[in-house]
UniProtKB/Swiss-Prot annotation:
Activity regulation (UniProt): Is strongly inhibited by hydroxylamine and EDTA in vitro.
NCBIfam families on file: PRK07048.1 (NF005454)
SUPFAM superfamilies: Tryptophan synthase beta subunit-like PLP-dependent enzymes
Superkingdom classification of source: Bacteria
Record Pfam families: PALP
Gene designation: thadh
Subunit record text: May be either a monomer or a homodimer.
Record-listed pyridoxal 5'-phosphate binding positions: 80, 179-183, 304
Cofactor remark from the record: Requires a divalent metal cation such as Mn(2+), Mg(2+), or Ca(2+).
General function of this protein: Catalyzes the deamination of L-threo-3-hydroxyaspartate to oxaloacetate and ammonia. Shows a high specificity towards L-threo-3-hydroxyaspartate as other 3-hydroxyaminoacids, i.e. D,L-erythro- and D-threo-3-hydroxyaspartate, D-threonine, L-threonine, D,L-allothreonine, D,L-threo-3-phenylserine, D-serine, and L-serine, are not substrates for this enzyme. Exhibits no detectable serine and aspartate racemase activity. Might play a role in the detoxification of naturally occurring 3-hydroxyaspartate in Pseudomonas sp. T62 cells.
pH dependence: Optimum pH is 9.0.
Protein name: L-threo-3-hydroxyaspartate ammonia-lyase
Family: Belongs to the serine/threonine dehydratase family.
Keywords assigned: Lyase, Magnesium, Manganese, Pyridoxal phosphate
Length: 319
């Protein structure tokens, strides 16, 4: 298996031009004072569909041939990849079917349907979404695009870090949320090309530390679906495409608690007036845990998404 390279990220950026938002990079005096660092926040919560996932989805679908476009695409997702695929399919004028868990946030399900996709539900505790997706693909001749373990998907995700580093110049450290590894592996390709000395950290919820364990042992660790408010990181294992890139290019994998995610959600709302979903807060929570470790340095965070039900959001912030 040939691993993806930074060249693939560059080509993905060319395909995304005119379709994906070049999301803003914000700063916060409050956060700089708290950490002692100069912190740059890449806001993928302001991406189309409210998440970085649109980047990888559009890049993958844009490479379909005419027969694939006619047959359509099938994907399985807890929400953000679903919306990314649904919108990309609409823009490229192809049918899309999305396999989503029964407990997926209602806002994500509604948005997926509004983009024109057909939604098929599964029970994430008792059913295998990958098998359901493969079966649908075989039955209807559709192409299956996984949410992270695909070279075109991870290359597309890497364009967010490419934009960040082209804006900031070299960074001393960069914090990125970790679920299946699409964003982290794509970010690693861009970071090693544009800021080779940058310390790159993946961040997982404590309950879903399969990535950390995989990184420590050198082989992919499988776990049960983790119980965490970070629904975008409720993955059971890293991917065959993502893990080798992570193993070779990431400095460490950190974990944070759900309580720390809520505190970071509160920070984004109170200090930066931004709605960020729990998974999108992984990077900030990890940086804040490290206190003043990066005093005097330039640090980046990628906020991966802002799709969260209003009721759940209010409930979490109330505590």
């Amino acid at each position: 298996m040939q691993l993806s390279s930074y060249h693939d990220v560059i080509k993905a950026a060319e395909r995304l031009e005119g379709f994906a938002n070049r999301t803003p990079v914000f700063t916060s005096r409050t956060l700089d004072a708290e950490t002692g660092a100069q912190v740059f926040i890449k806001c993928e919560n302001l991406q189309r569909t409210g998440s970085f996932k649109f980047r990888g989805a559009f890049n993958a679908l844009s490479r379909f041939d005419e027969a694939q476009r006619k047959a359509g695409v099938v994907a399985f997702s807890s929400g953000n990849h679903a919306q990314g695929i649904a919108l990309a399919a609409r823009l490229l004028q192809m049918p899309a079917t999305i396999v989503m868990p029964t407990d997926a946030p209602a806002a994500k399900v509604a948005a997926t349907r509004e983009y024109g996709a057909t939604v098929v539900f599964y029970d994430r505790i008792t059913e295998d979404r990958e098998q359901i997706g493969r079966t649908l693909a075989e039955q209807h001749g559709m192409t299956l695009i996984p949410s992270y373990d695909h070279p075109d998907v991870l290359a597309g995700q890497g364009t967010a870090a490419k934009e960040l580093l082209e804006f900031t110049g070299p960074l001393d450290a960069l914090f990125v949320g970790l679920g299946g590894g699409g964003m982290l592996s794509g970010t690693a390709l861009a970071t090693r090309a544009l800021s080779p000395d940058c310390l790159l950290y993946g961040v997982e919820p404590e309950a879903g530390n399969d990535g950390q364990r995989s990184f420590q042992t050198g082989s992919i660790v499988h776990i049960d679906t983790p119980a965490t408010i970070a629904d975008g990181a409720q993955t059971q294992h890293l991917g065959n495409h993502t893990f080798p890139i992570i193993r070779e290019n990431v400095n460490d994998i950190l974990t944070v608690s759900d309580a720390e995610l809520v505190e970071s959600m509160r920070f984004f709302m109170q200090r930066m007036k931004m709605v960020v979903e729990p998974t999108g807060c992984l990077g900030l929570a990890a940086l804040r845990n490290l206190k003043q470790q990066f005093r005097g340095q330039r640090v980046g965070i990628i906020v991966t998404g802002g799709n969260v039900d209003i009721e759940k959001y209010a409930s979490l912030l109330k505590g």
